[in-house]
């Protein structure tokens, strides 16, 4: 499929056009028509009904939903993607409420600041959806994408969306969406690209505290940061004056290795080695909440169960339904930029960290190898990292 850039899609939306938004192939893997309520024209919903044929919904911010008393459709939401449907509505000025014109009227009234809860009949023929406050950075769904796109065009936080179906009633995917795009001359973007766009556009960390931290390996300055969209807490250890070409270690949290000195992995040994190096040569350790390469502590323990049955660290993740590595280094890049650092010497054996930082504008001037001894317990793990994951060990 050929995707357009986010800026061109925003321009199209602001001109009243409809675009196609495609989600992750591991999620619904479908395309929705998306329009911004404030900019859409009288033909938008008619086009969706005739050409896309899916359910026409109206994503809105939580503020709009609360102001208009749009309560959840059900108390116990069992939708597999957690889509926040409210009770369906028609505006009181409609008749049956089902015509494209009347659904357009209802959608427009959702963003009218003079509208009140009593102005909408329930149930109706338009289905509001409530977006997460943090948008696609909290949930990578079409609901959040529509509201984020509206905000990025400068409009009120509301949109209209509709799934695209093929002529035979199946959901349009892949080349079907490409043909639909070409037939109707529409812009097409991915939610993943929208996520990256927002990450580059908006600050994602907040500085919270700085203290002196004496350790077994020397005394460091410890900075505390909070990720604004996930509420994750990140700590950074520094030694010496902060400068360009700083020696930097990105360390993914490993409770079992860092705290309990597990020999299943080499994480604890790498952290200690890096602290000794930074204490001697100066630099920075960014300690990231990425337990189990991003799958979390309990899932990592589940992966260990599979490893005890003969899986390796990669195939265990895949068997649990995860990619081999879910980590993203945007937060790390944001922290480096907070310190005005764009060029670093990276303490790492993992090539994916190099690429992960480069895509966010960080230049890797030099790689510093982290050498730790192998144990009888982590031999297979180390071999898998080297052979399957390309680690330089």
UniProtKB/Swiss-Prot annotation:
Site residues, Essential for DHBP synthase activity: 125, 163
Active site: residue positions: 325, 327
Region (GTP cyclohydrolase II): 201-393
Assigned keywords, A-Z: GTP-binding, Hydrolase, Lyase, Magnesium, Manganese, Metal-binding, Multifunctional enzyme, Nucleotide-binding, Riboflavin biosynthesis, Zinc
Binding site for D-ribulose 5-phosphate: 27-28, 32, 139-143, 163
Pathway: Cofactor biosynthesis; riboflavin biosynthesis; 2-hydroxy-3-oxobutyl phosphate from D-ribulose 5-phosphate: step 1/1; Cofactor biosynthesis; riboflavin biosynthesis; 5-amino-6-(D-ribitylamino)uracil from GTP: step 1/4
Cofactor(s) needed by this chain: Mg(2+); Mn(2+); Zn(2+)
Binding site for GTP: 249-253, 270, 291-293, 313, 348, 353
Recorded catalytic activity of this chain's protein: D-ribulose 5-phosphate = (2S)-2-hydroxy-3-oxobutyl phosphate + formate + H(+); GTP + 4 H2O = 2,5-diamino-6-hydroxy-4-(5-phosphoribosylamino)-pyrimidine + formate + 2 phosphate + 3 H(+)
Binding site for Zn(2+): 254, 265, 267
A single GO BP: riboflavin biosynthetic process
GO molecular function: 3,4-dihydroxy-2-butanone-4-phosphate synthase activity; GTP binding; GTP cyclohydrolase II activity; magnesium ion binding; manganese ion binding; zinc ion binding
Family (UniProt): In the N-terminal section; belongs to the DHBP synthase family.
Biological function: Catalyzes the conversion of D-ribulose 5-phosphate to formate and 3,4-dihydroxy-2-butanone 4-phosphate. Catalyzes the conversion of GTP to 2,5-diamino-6-ribosylamino-4(3H)-pyrimidinone 5'-phosphate (DARP), formate and pyrophosphate.
Identification of the protein by name: Riboflavin biosynthesis protein RibBA
């Amino acid at each position: 499929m050929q995707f357009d850039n986010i800026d061109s899609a925003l321009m199209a939306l602001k001109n009243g056009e409809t675009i196609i938004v495609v989600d992750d192939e591991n999620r619904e893997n479908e395309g929705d028509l998306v329009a911004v309520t404030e900019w859409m024209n009288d033909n938008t919903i008619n086009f969706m009904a005739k050409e896309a044929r899916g359910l026409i919904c109206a994503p809105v911010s939580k503020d709009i939903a609360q102001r208009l008393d749009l309560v959840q459709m059900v108390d116990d939401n069992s939708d597999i993607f957690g889509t926040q449907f409210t009770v369906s509505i028609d505006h009181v000025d409609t008749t049956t409420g089902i015509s494209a014109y009347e659904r357009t009227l209802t959608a427009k009234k959702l963003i009218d600041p003079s509208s009140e809860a009593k102005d909408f009949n329930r149930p109706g023929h338009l289905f509001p959806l409530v977006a997460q406050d943090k948008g696609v950075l909290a949930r990578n769904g079409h609901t959040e994408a529509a509201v984020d796109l509206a905000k990025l065009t400068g409009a009120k936080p509301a949109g209209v969306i509709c799934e695209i179906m093929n002529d035979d009633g199946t959901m349009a995917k892949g080349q079907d969406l490409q043909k639909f795009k070409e037939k109707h001359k529409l812009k097409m973007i991915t939610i993943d690209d929208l996520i990256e766009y927002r990450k580059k556009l908006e600050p994602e960390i907040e500085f919270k505290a700085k203290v002196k931290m004496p350790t077994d390996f020397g005394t460091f300055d410890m900075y505390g940061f909070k990720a604004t969209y996930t509420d994750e807490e990140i700590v950074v250890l520094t030694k010496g004056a902060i400068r360009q070409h700083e020696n930097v270690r990105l360390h993914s949290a490993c409770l079992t290795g860092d705290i309990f000195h597990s020999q299943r992995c080499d994480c604890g040994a790498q952290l200690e080695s890096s602290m000794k190096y930074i204490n001697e040569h100066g630099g920075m350790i960014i300690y990231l909440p990425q337990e189990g390469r991003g799958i979390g502590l309990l899932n990592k323990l589940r992966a260990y169960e599979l490893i005890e049955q003969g899986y390796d660290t990669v195939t265990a993740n895949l068997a649990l339904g995860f990619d081999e590595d879910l980590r993203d280094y945007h937060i790390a890049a944001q922290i480096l930029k907070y310190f005005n650092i764009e060029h670093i010497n990276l303490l790492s054996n993992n090539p994916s960290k190099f690429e992960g930082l480069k895509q966010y504008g960080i230049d890797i001037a030099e790689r510093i190898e982290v050498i730790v001894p192998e144990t009888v317990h982590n031999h297979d793990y180390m071999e898998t990292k080297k052979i399957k994951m390309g680690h330089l060990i």
